[in-house]
A protein has these predicted regions:
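Conserved N-terminal Rossmann-fold NAD(P) cofactor-binding segment
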Residues: 257-279
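Crotonase-fold acyl-CoA enzyme core
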Residues: 14-131
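Gly/Ala-rich phosphate-binding loop of Rossmann-like dinucleotide-binding domains
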Residues: 240, 244
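Amphipathic alpha-helical segments at domain termini/boundaries
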Residues: 36-39, 84-187, 201-220
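N-terminal Rossmann-fold NAD(P) dinucleotide-binding loop
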Residues: 236-237
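Conserved acidic E/D residue at the C-terminus of a beta-strand in Rossmann-like folds
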Residues: 56, 251-257, 261-262
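An acidic, glycine-rich surface segment that forms the CoA-thioester-binding/catalytic face
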Residues: 1-27, 67-69, 74, 200-222
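Conserved N-terminal Rossmann-fold NAD(P)-binding element of oxidoreductases
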Residues: 229-231
Length: 279
C-alpha cells in the first residue's frame, strides 16, 4: 500500500525539532519505524527486557525515516552498520552500552516521569542529528567502513539493501543531516521499487500465511527416521552429515558407484575429524 500522510520521516523531523525535550519510553520490541521515532527523540529510556532493532534489511529495504543517519551518531559507525545489516535486535543492556538508550528501567512509567523532570531542568537538550562525537575519529571510521564493505561483499553477494545501508552511513559522515536524510530517502525509494524487496516482502507474508492454513496448523508432524539425499557433492554431503548428527539414517543416491564412494568417503572423513576433535 502507498504510504499515507503524515509520512514517518516527517514525523521524526517534527519530533526532533520540538522545542521541549522528548523522552521515548520503550518496552517490548522497538523495531523499525518504532525505533526510528525513538532515535529522533532527545532521550530514550528502556525497560530492561526491551529488544531494539532495525530489521528492514530482511525485506530488502533500509531504515527510511532517519535510522541510517541517527543510529551512527549514537552507536558509532561499526555498531550501527552491524545492527542494520544483520537486521537482528539487540538487548536494552547492549543498547545502553552503545549509547542508543540513556537509561534502563524496571518501572518504566514512573522512571520515565522522573527522568523527564530531571532533564527538564537542563537548558539544552541533545538533538540526535546534531551529535558528532562518534564521527571524530576519521581513521577509525574509515577502517570500519572498509571492513564492513568487504564483509558485505562476502556475506551478502548480490543483495542490494546491505550495500545501500553502507552507502547511507557513509553519507551520514560526509554530508550534513538534511542532505543525508535526503540521500537515505532516495535510497529507500530505489530499493522499494526494486525486484529484490518485492520478492523478500512476498516471501515474508507468504511464510506467515502458510502457518495459517488449517490443514497445516492441525496436522501432526510425521516421525522421520530415514532421509534420502540425492547427490553426494558438497551440498549433499553437508546435508548427510547434519542428518547423521541428528540421529537419522541416510540413504545417499548418486548416478554411479564412483561418485557414491566419493560422497561416502567425504562424509566419513568429516565425521572422523569431528570425533578426533571431541565434537
Amino acid at each position: 500500500q502507498p504510504p499515507q500522510e503524515p509520512h514517518l520521516p516527517e514525523v521524526c523531523e517534527e519530533i526532533e525539532n520540538i522545542d521541549k525535550p522528548v523522552i521515548a519510553a520503550l518496552h517490548g520490541t522497538a523495531l523499525g519505524g518504532g525505533l526510528e521515532i525513538a532515535l529522533a527523540s532527545n532521550y530514550r529510556i528502556a525497560e530492561e527486557k526491551t529488544k531494539l532493532g532495525l530489521p528492514e534489511v530482511n525485506l530488502g529495504l533500509l531504515p527510511g525515516a532517519g535510522g541510517t543517519q541517527r543510529l551512527p551518531r549514537l552507536a558509532g559507525i561499526s555498531a550501527a552498520l552491524q545492527i542494520m545489516t544483520s537486521g537482528k535486535p539487540i538487548s536494552a543492556s547492549e543498547a545502553l552500552k552503545l549509547g542508543v538508550v540513556d537509561k534502563i528501567s524496571t518501572n518504566l512509567l514512573e522512571d520515565a516521569k522522573a527522568f523527564a523532570k530531571q532533564v527538564a531542568e537542563k537548558n539544552s537538550h541533545p538533538k540526535t542529528s546534531m551529535l558528532t562525537e562518534k564521527f571524530d575519529n576519521d581513521e577509525l571510521n574509515k577502517e570500519a567502513i572498509a571492513s564492513m564493505k568487504e564483509l558485505i561483499q562476502q556475506k551478502f553477494g548480490a543483495l542490494e539493501a546491505p550495500k545501500k545501508i553502507l552507502e547511507c552511513v557513509e553519507a551520514s559522515i560526509s554530508m550534513d543531516i538534511s542532505e543525508g536524510l535526503k540521500y537515505e530517502r532516495n535510497s529507500f525509494s530505489e530499493l522499494m521499487a526494486g525486484k529484490q524487496s518485492k520478492a523478500l516482502i512476498h516471501a515474508f507474508f507468504a511464510e506467515r500465511k502458510s502457518a495459517k492454513i488449517p490443514e497445516v496448523s492441525r496436522a501432526n508432524a510425521r516421525d522421520i527416521k530415514t532421509l534420502s539425499v540425492i547427490g553426494g557433492g558438497t551440498m549433499g554431503a553437508g546435508i548427510t552429515i547434519a542428518a547423521l548428527n541428528a540421529g537419522l539414517k541416510v540413504k545417499m543416491i548418486e548416478q554411479d558407484n564412483e561418485n557414491l564412494n566419493k560422497g561416502i568417503q567425504h562424509v566419513t572423513k568429516v565425521l572422523e575429524r569431528d570425533v578426533d576433535k571431541g565434537r
